[in-house]
Amino acid sequence: MLIVALATVRTRWAAFAGTFAALALGVSVIAMMTLVLAAASGGNVHQRPERFAAVPSVIQADPNLQVRDRYGSADSVPLLAQPDVPASVIARLPGAIPDRSFYAQVQGVSAAQPALGHGWSSAAFAPYVLTSGHAPSSDNEIVVAGSATVGSRVPVVTAGGSRTYTIAGTVHPRTGEQPIFFTDVEAARLSPGVDALVTYDAATADRAAALPGVHLQVLTGADRHEADPGAVQDTTELTGLTTFLGVAALISAFVAVTVTATAFGLSVAQRRRDLALLRTIGATPKQVMRMVCADAALVGAGGSAAGCLLGLAGAPQLASWIVRQGLAPSWFRVHFTTGSVLALVVAFLAGVAVAVLSVLVAAVRAGTIRPTDALREAAVEPKRIGPFRLLGGLVALFCGVAALAAVALIFPSAATDQKTEAEIVILLIVGTALLSPFLLRLLTRPFGRGTAGMLLRASILTGARRAAAAIVPVLITAGLAASILGASDTANAAASAGEHQQAAGADFVVLPAGTPGLTAALVDRIHSISGVEATAVTDTNMLVFQPPITSLHLEAPIPIPFSAIGIDHLSAALNLKVTAGSLTGLDDQTIAVDSSWDKHVGDTMRLWQPDGTPVSLKVIAVVASSGLSGPSLIVDLHNAGAPMPARVYAKTDSGASAAALLAAVRSQHARVVPISGWSAAVSDQQAKQNQVGLELLLGIAIAYSAIGIASTFLMSTGGRRSELALLHMTGAIRRQIVWIVAAESLVLTLIGIVLSAVVSGLVLGALYVALTGEIGSVSIILPW
């Protein structure tokens, strides 16, 4: 039968062209996603060190929190900020050179790269070489990178405020940062914490690695990049990208597998006469099954190989697009490693497996059916759908609807999780696709009026499986787009509305302009304005051992991050509805939680600041939940771990105080925005960021589905040559035949859109119920 399979593929290559193209494109999608996912999972191993390129060893505090989980096993949790090197370690390593990195920027000069200040002794680590002038010799002198006039005086902005310095010299710029070098004494004043220690002595590095009671990492070789500015942020971005690509790969694989399986199933259905003839002339069931599976394996191997080559070519382009959209660090690239080879092998095997499994059920049926029944089914397609298809469709629909009900009524917080959305939509689409031959009888009734309509409906129902194969790509394309985009837009709008409830009492918000935050001097100036009540706010995350509750009412075994805001003090500008206790006494020893936590006033919570500093805080207040993306914890600015507040909410009592606020902020690297304008701007920015991600998530999948639609319709039409020829022989003219084919394609497309609208309606309806229960009235936003 292998010889027969080879001959079949060779002589009927045109019949297999559609399935080959569908499989090649499907495997290319899977290969691209897995290659980029493998590159993101590999972290920054391919990035060369920049700031510490000229030193052999860099000593840092461990960027992971070392804990024991609830089962007593050692575990580590990535920290949200790089911790400082403990003072005790510095004292025990006298030969190591301290390195400090902190925000510092020449006023009025935009920073294309991170603007950072260092002590002059750190310049040799890169190395930075003087191109003019001399090293800073007093605390009011600096050295800058690039072109500048030596001897000129410039204002420099740091977290504390602005101060004028004299440019003593310049150095040649390097990639990765825009540095300003101070004297070591001035750098220590501006940033007391030590970010890293540098040693040229191997013995000192070994001693640091063996120090008891502390968790340090000694970086050498390519690992020195982990100490570069922004390395923690790069790791965070790659972690988020890995999570996101996992969801994207899930959806892309689903689309590829479904469209490919549909194409292969249709190709087998179009060969019913061949298979019936083989059974009639004496071919055994096993021989027929082997032949069909061999056909699929041959086409699958060729299509998978072509798809892997396309994936190899497309993965670097996809990675470049991800970088341009700001979803990954600027240096992120696809490097071909052992992980890449494994990704290609997985994509290839997945393609062959999909091809064989897609025809397996049809092959079993074709092989086991009696010859006389095979001839009858070859002439007229059976009207009933198979029991396995019926059972699979019902189970998938039941699971999808049950999951929607659970999200809407029991776990509304899961409504905004993209992975949950994708899984539910996939279940509903799979169930609807499997039951589509049965649903066709109901949905084609409106088209059965009149002679032409009756002929059209009869043509569709006679080839119900063929028609269902044409519906599936339409269902996937429209269903995914409407469900996931609509759910995302709706959730973003609802979450944004909830987030801005905290600023409902403010008239204005002060935002940084060209700086990473607001300086302490500016915040103090705003607080000193008569008639202005203000609260400085920064967004952060705190690691907490015990989450409020999981979907199964279990405690998480390790600390996980929870959103929080840090505030400097309470004012009328901050709108937090207190349901128990009071926020008046909020300080560095206390905390407030929202109502989702099972905590009461007087309880003590064990937390970790973003840099891993452990704190035990007393709950002094419980506040109402402020929405799906609002903070669940409220702490003071010290515990927030951010040196510069992100914004200041300000409430003015008169036009004069508003004018004073504007005057105070002028020329202070900040801007004043009316609260309504700020809410809209932030909402638009959040929507844009989410939209970029969803374009990546759905763009490839929808494009592939569109190709699948064209391929399936071409295969369906090509398999009806004898039927169309019979119509022509009975008197139908060419225009009438074209009208019948076009009308049938249009009707099937409309049915696919209707089914996708039902799926989207179920998803968005459940989302509406979930969001209404969480934050009140919401509006469903459709993606058009």
Label each PLM-derived region with a short phrase.
Residues 8, 12-15, 256-300, 369, ...:
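Interfacial "coupling" helices/loops that link adjacent transmembrane helices in transporter permeases
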